[in-house]
Amino acid sequence: MAHSFDIAFVGSGNLASHLAKNLEKAGHRILGVSSRRMERAQELAKQLGADTLAVDDPKQLPEAEIYVLAIADDALPNLWQTWTPPNKRALVVHTSGSVSLDSIQSLSERTGVLYPLQTFSANRPLDFSEIPCFVEGSDEEVTQTLLELAKSVSHEVNPLDSERRRTLHL
């Protein structure tokens, strides 16, 4: 792996859990997990290790290089109206197949999408390396960062714009 990233997650559901665990296994540091349900954040943080902070408000997340917004599509608009990352140069990434990249551009100068093409279940083990992942970045540097991040957990990673991703998601 070329670079190890410091990452914080907003969301603790099935996708967040699988992605966070696999990113950590790949050598990245998961600094914090935020969830509306504190017990879910604590459960995931415990699985990720002693240094992972669990909070119930994303405003309490520690400063990170990358913030992954792994929450329900319908919860995203409320989040981007009420939250900004503590690190203004942070890369803010959502994981939705149906939400455009433009929708989060007010959160940071550096935004992107990391979309794993998979339905995630809590108790079903997955080989994340076999899951196709699609990325889109606000600029070429962000796209390259997301390609590197996604390739650390998946063997099948490709760039894909919002319109084609939405079609694929449906």
Predicted segments with their positions:
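NAD(P)+-binding Rossmann beta1-loop-alpha1 motif at the extreme N-terminus of oxidoreductases
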Residues: 1-56
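Short phosphate-binding/catalytic loops that engage adenosine nucleotides
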Residues: 28-29, 109, 155
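Internal alpha-helical scaffold of NAD(P)-dependent oxidoreductase catalytic cores
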Residues: 40-47, 125-169
